[in-house]
Structure formats: C-alpha cells, structure tokens
Amino acid sequence: MLLILANWLEHYFDVFRVFHYLTLRGILGILTALVISFIVGPPMIRYLGSYKIGQTIRDDGPQSHLSKAGTPTMGGALILVTITVSTLLWSDLGNRYVWAVLLVTLAYGLIGFVDDYKKLVLKNSKGLAARYKYLWQSVFGLGAALFLYHTASSPQETQFIVPFFKQVVLNMGWLYVPLVYFVVVGSSNAVNLTDGLDGLAILPTVLVAGGLAIFAYASGHSEFSEYLGIPYLPKAGELVVFCGALVGAGLGFLWFNTYPAQVFMGDIGALALGAALGMVAVLVRQEIVLMIMGGIFVMETVSVMLQVLSFKLTGRRIFRMAPIHHHFELKGWPEPRVIVRFWIISVILVLIGLATLKLR
C-alpha cells in the first residue's frame, strides 16, 4: 500500500526510491508489527480477560499448569492483525505470492477462531469437531496447492529441491499438489501441537520465519540464487516483507506470552502460523529445510504419533505424556527450563537449515 505511494512520490523526490529495497521494507515490516503489538496488545488482553475468554486446563496434565486456568487466550488474533496490517502496508500488493500466503494464513486463523470460540465462548469442550477441522484445513490447503500449481510461470516453481546436494532437483509435475497440501496442513498442526507452554511455539516460529526470509531473499535475486545453487524465483523476494511482519508480530506477542504468560495464542494463532510457515517454505521450494529448521515442531508431532501408535499396539505409553514437552515437565523439569532448552535447540536447527545454502 505504502509502496504504491512511494512509487508515485519518487517521481518528485528521489529519496522515496529506497522503498524498492526489500531489506528496508522487511525491517519496516518488523518494526511496524512490533509497534502495533505493543499498542494493541494490552487493551486486547484486557478485553479477552473481561469477557472470561480464558484457557481451560487438562486435569491429567502437569499440576503446575492448574494456575494457568483462566489466562486470556485467542491472543493469536493480535498476531493476525499485526501481520496483516504490516504486510499490506509494506509489500507489493501486485505479487501473487504475498496474497497466497496471507490469505491462507487468515483462512487457517479462521478455522482456529471457530474452534476457540466454540470451546471458550460457547463452552463446548470439544470445540470444532476434528473431522470438520481437518476438512476445512484440507479444503484451504488443497485450494492453495491447486492455485500455485495452475499459476506457476516456470518449472522452478514446482520443482522439489534436495538440500546439501548441488543441482539435485525433482520435477514434481502434478505431485506438487499433494506435496503442498501435506506441507501446509502438516506444518499447521505441528505448530498447534507445540503450543503447550508459555512462549514455546512462538519463538521457534519467529526463528524459522527469519530463516525462510533469507531463503526468500536469495531466491528472488538472480545472482544470489545462481551462486548458492537454489532456484531463481523472481516473485519470491517479496515474501521477505511477509516474513518480517511475522517476525515482528511474533516478537510482539512473545512480550506478553513469555513465562508466566499474560495471554495464550490459542488455535487461532497456532494453526495460522503453522500454515504461514508451510506456505512460505513451498513458495521458496525449501520443504526439507522447513523440516530441519522447524525440527522442534517435527519432534513434537512425532512424539504424539509414537505415543498413540504404541498405546494402540501394546497398551503402553512411550512418554509420560505427549507432546514431548509435557514428558519433560512430568520428569521434574521446571517449565522455563523446558522452554529455553527447546528454544536453544530451535536456534541450532535454524542455523543448520541456513547452512544448507553453502553446504552443497
């Protein structure tokens, strides 16, 4: 939006040409999202608290969590508002990548909102039935996949990139559609499973978004992409602005979500953020890198799958409780220790993911 204004003003004032630089707009996206979070966050938290939109706690969970009951949730709405406003202000609104990732993020946020609203406002303990939740996730995920497949303007947009190896690419053809579907839906649910402790999911999300922003910038630059051996995707660079908005919104939310949390994001935030990461990863053709950088999300998801499978086959549980962060709590780890150690692991994994740019 402001880029359109800058394009007009540059005809009269040369200084406005600086807004063509992605790095500047990415930084402004971060700062704008942060400022909005700090301004809107406190009144939104008070509003959620005044309407008793508070978190419910599992009786069979760690006893330390009982004190969290009633903490305002659905704070993911703050994240979505800040991402949307910042992205619309600083991105090129003629870029289909920007609209694709933003609309999918909001669509998954809508699914999460309905689930949270049913549980917290209508007091329906089951929320949105699982079959309907996965149905709508599938509808939006498949819709995004078909849109990207049919609007792809070059073979590079639908290739599967194998990191650590030079020039190892697979032309996916129509298999690109199920790939995008599984990455977006899987990433959405993985982040949702991770969102069980104060700040546990949001900082890894911020770190992964920052890492993907670097891939987006390199992919959108012909010289960098050729030098690094990654596909050249002219439209991908604009995703730097979206990722910047996500980073700023995430850091702004963490200000209120850090231990002890003043607000939780709820499904409205977790489902949306996971879908956003999945969309950016498929748009810059780095699905495997997403699994590396988002290894915390993968670990949490696998722990749930193993727990369910083991219990169904043997009647025994592998972990004291799943997802695995609860296992460590029940082993006696204080919640802040679990959170910070998972954060440290996430930093390491993001660095490994970034290393794939050169280790080929």
Curated annotation (Swiss-Prot):
Reactions it catalyzes: UDP-N-acetyl-alpha-D-muramoyl-L-alanyl-gamma-D-glutamyl-meso-2,6-diaminopimeloyl-D-alanyl-D-alanine + di-trans,octa-cis-undecaprenyl phosphate = di-trans,octa-cis-undecaprenyl diphospho-N-acetyl-alpha-D-muramoyl-L-alanyl-D-glutamyl-meso-2,6-diaminopimeloyl-D-alanyl-D-alanine + UMP
Domain of life, source organism: Bacteria
Biological processes per GO annotation: cell division; cell wall organization; peptidoglycan biosynthetic process; regulation of cell shape
The protein's Enzyme Commission number: 2.7.8.13
Gene Ontology annotations for the cellular component aspect, listed alphabetically: plasma membrane
Keyword tags: Cell cycle, Cell division, Cell inner membrane, Cell membrane, Cell shape, Cell wall biogenesis/degradation, Magnesium, Membrane, Metal-binding, Peptidoglycan synthesis, Transferase, Transmembrane, Transmembrane helix
Cofactors demanded by this protein: Mg(2+)
Compartment list: Cell inner membrane
Membrane topology: Multi-pass membrane protein
Residues spanning the signal sequence: none
Enzyme class: transferase
UniProt main location, coarse: membrane
Pathway entry: Cell wall biogenesis; peptidoglycan biosynthesis
GO function terms (MF aspect): metal ion binding; phospho-N-acetylmuramoyl-pentapeptide-transferase activity; UDP-N-acetylmuramoyl-L-alanyl-D-glutamyl-meso-2,6-diaminopimelyl-D-alanyl-D-alanine:undecaprenyl-phosphate transferase activity
Keyword Transmembrane helix among record annotations: yes
Family in the record: Belongs to the glycosyltransferase 4 family. MraY subfamily.
HAMAP family recorded: MraY
Annotated PANTHER family: PHOSPHO-N-ACETYLMURAMOYL-PENTAPEPTIDE-TRANSFERASE (PTHR22926), PHOSPHO-N-ACETYLMURAMOYL-PENTAPEPTIDE-TRANSFERASE HOMOLOG (PTHR22926:SF5)
NCBIfam families (UniProt xref): mraY (TIGR00445)
Name of the protein described by the UniProt record: Phospho-N-acetylmuramoyl-pentapeptide-transferase
Organism the protein comes from: Methylococcus capsulatus (strain ATCC 33009 / NCIMB 11132 / Bath)
